[in-house]
From Swiss-Prot:
<comment type="similarity">
    <text>Belongs to the thymidylate synthase family. Bacterial-type ThyA subfamily.</text>
</comment>
<feature type="binding site" description="in other chain">
    <location>
        <position position="177"/>
    </location>
    <ligand>
        <name>dUMP</name>
    </ligand>
</feature>
<dbReference type="GO" id="GO:0004799">
    <property type="term" value="F:thymidylate synthase activity"/>
</dbReference>
<feature type="binding site">
    <location>
        <position position="169"/>
    </location>
    <ligand>
        <name>(6R)-5,10-methylene-5,6,7,8-tetrahydrofolate</name>
    </ligand>
</feature>
<dbReference type="GO" id="GO:0006231">
    <property type="term" value="P:dTMP biosynthetic process"/>
</dbReference>
<feature type="binding site" description="in other chain">
    <location>
        <position position="21"/>
    </location>
    <ligand>
        <name>dUMP</name>
    </ligand>
</feature>
<comment type="pathway">
    <text>Pyrimidine metabolism; dTTP biosynthesis.</text>
</comment>
<keyword id="KW-0545">Nucleotide biosynthesis</keyword>
<dbReference type="GO" id="GO:0006235">
    <property type="term" value="P:dTTP biosynthetic process"/>
</dbReference>
<feature type="binding site" description="in other chain">
    <location>
        <begin position="207"/>
        <end position="209"/>
    </location>
    <ligand>
        <name>dUMP</name>
    </ligand>
</feature>
<comment type="function">
    <text>Catalyzes the reductive methylation of 2'-deoxyuridine-5'-monophosphate (dUMP) to 2'-deoxythymidine-5'-monophosphate (dTMP) while utilizing 5,10-methylenetetrahydrofolate (mTHF) as the methyl donor and reductant in the reaction, yielding dihydrofolate (DHF) as a by-product. This enzymatic reaction provides an intracellular de novo source of dTMP, an essential precursor for DNA biosynthesis.</text>
</comment>
<protein>
    <recommendedName>
        <fullName>Thymidylate synthase</fullName>
        <ecNumber>2.1.1.45</ecNumber>
    </recommendedName>
</protein>
<dbReference type="InterPro" id="IPR023451">
    <property type="entry name" value="Thymidate_synth/dCMP_Mease_dom"/>
</dbReference>
<feature type="binding site">
    <location>
        <position position="263"/>
    </location>
    <ligand>
        <name>(6R)-5,10-methylene-5,6,7,8-tetrahydrofolate</name>
    </ligand>
</feature>
<dbReference type="InterPro" id="IPR000398">
    <property type="entry name" value="Thymidylate_synthase"/>
</dbReference>
<dbReference type="GO" id="GO:0005829">
    <property type="term" value="C:cytosol"/>
</dbReference>
<dbReference type="GO" id="GO:0032259">
    <property type="term" value="P:methylation"/>
</dbReference>
Length: 264
């Protein structure tokens, strides 16, 4: 994951000081891309320990179409708590948009089922896209989508995915986002009898928060270690039937975790 550390260095060297919604302040660059060949290992940051339980359960929560933190709490995941209301609701965030995008005529579109069908029937289509950026519902969301738009691509029997992330917290959020979409590519490839290809990450406002500078400096002193490998323990009936126990990460040997505050 050297390219992740290189991104940190770039933000530190070239970033513009900016105010932000949270009032914390950032160093920010605009427009950056990284490519991860998923054949070469699972892109889980090794220069600090990542909380894989949270990454997996959050993705399953998205795929279930849920927007209340109750499922996450049942599985000891608290990463969305800061934005939830007193009932645990977040409004029409990722799960709602992925699984039940509302149309003007009252229909709902299950975008995940739709792209799975497209990949089976029209793998060369240039329209195999999921969007969480529903302009008509942004004001109802506890947090507007950061990872907002992703596209799939099939070539030579391999499934690739590119994500556009309009806002990226490089220290805390980005390792989660990379691992989450890499997981999704592995799951979809298994369901479609394809090999995994590349995960391409594209960032818009790509930033380090001002209260993450010491943690970033510490992480940059550490040498990356070999990437782990993801093993899927079984093949469920559909993309929606995976369980936490289905994901086995082999050979993950990270440096110790580094704590940092979340900007809310």
């Amino acid at each position: 994951m050297k390219q992740y550390l290189d991104l940190m260095r770039k933000v530190l060297a070239e970033g513009t000081p900016k105010a932000d919604r949270t009032g914390t302040g950032t160093l920010s660059i605009f427009g950056h891309q990284m490519r991860f060949n998923l054949q070469q290992g699972f892109p889980l940051v090794t220069t600090k320990k990542c909380h894989l339980r949270s990454i997996i359960h959050e993705l399953l929560w998205f795929l279930n179409g849920e927007t209340n933190v109750s499922y996450l709490h049942e599985n000891n995941v608290t990463i969305w708590d800061e934005w939830a209301d007193d009932n645990g609701d977040l409004g029409p965030v990722y799960g709602k948009q992925w699984r039940a995008w509302g149309c003007a005529d009252g229909r709902q579109v299950d975008q995940i089922s739709q792209v799975m069908e497209q990949l089976r029937q029209e793998p060369d289509s240039r329209r195999i896209i999921v969007s969480a950026w529903n302009v008509g519902e942004l004001d109802q969301m506890a947090l507007a989508p950061c990872h907002a738009f992703f596209q799939f691509y099939v070539a030579d029997g391999r499934l690739s995915c590119q994500l556009y992330q309009r806002s990226c917290d490089v220290f805390l959020g980005l390792p989660f986002n990379i691992a989450s979409y890499a997981l999704l590519v592995h799951m979809m490839a298994q369901q479609l009898d394809l090999q995994v290809g590349d995960f391409v990450w594209t960032g818009g406002d790509t930033h380090l928060y001002s209260n993450h500078m010491e943690q970033t400096a510490l992480q940059l002193t550490r040498e990356p270690r070999a990437l782990p490998r993801l093993v899927l323990a079984r093949r469920p009936a559909s993309i929606f039937d995976y369980r936490f126990e289905d994901f086995i990460i082999e050979g993950y040997d990270p440096h110790p975790a580094i704590k940092a505050p979340v900007a809310v």
